């Protein structure tokens, strides 16, 4: 489990080859031009698991369970610990991120991993990556 709250960043960080702390410190110090920021080839996809009703009215406080494999690819957003239990505590609950050699493989893997997460009122969009995959297909 990682802690982060921006799905767009969660979909890029797995591709970062450079040391994140070094990049952040250089950004803070105004020396980013002196740092080599490198990304691996391939693609990544982050599927956000939200509370049903988000962004309007939603309920929270539900126990979250997940497979070990899903937990290894999970960024926590709207969740909190209560003892040993992870509970929903917001609208955007978790981001499940997968990286793969191709966009199609990354999208499929992220959705497969998302199936390993359960909580009451879980909502998962089914269109993540669809437009990018369609555009990619048009270029082929």
Language-model features and meaning:
Residues 2-71, 82:
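Active-site "cap" helix and flanking loop/linker of ATP-utilizing ligase/carboxylase catalytic domains
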Residues 48-50, 77, 99:
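Generic beta-strand/beta-sheet core signal
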Residues 80-83, 87-140:
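Generic C-terminus detector
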């Amino acid at each position: 489990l990682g802690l982060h709250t921006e799905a767009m960043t969660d979909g890029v960080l797995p591709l970062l080859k450079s040391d994140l702390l070094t990049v952040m410190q250089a950004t803070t110090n105004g020396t980013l031009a002196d740092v080599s920021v490198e990304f691996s080839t391939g693609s990544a996809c982050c599927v956000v698991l939200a509370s049903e009703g988000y962004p309007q009215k939603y309920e929270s406080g539900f126990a979250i369970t997940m497979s070990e494999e899903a937990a290894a690819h999970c960024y926590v957003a709207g969740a909190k610990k209560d003892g040993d239990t992870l509970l929903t505590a917001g609208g955007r609950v978790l981001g499940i991120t997968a990286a793969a050699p191709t966009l199609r493989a990354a999208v499929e893997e992220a959705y497969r991993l998302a199936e390993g997460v359960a909580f009451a009122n879980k909502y998962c969009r089914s269109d993540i990556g669809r437009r990018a995959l369609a555009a990619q297909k048009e270029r082929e």
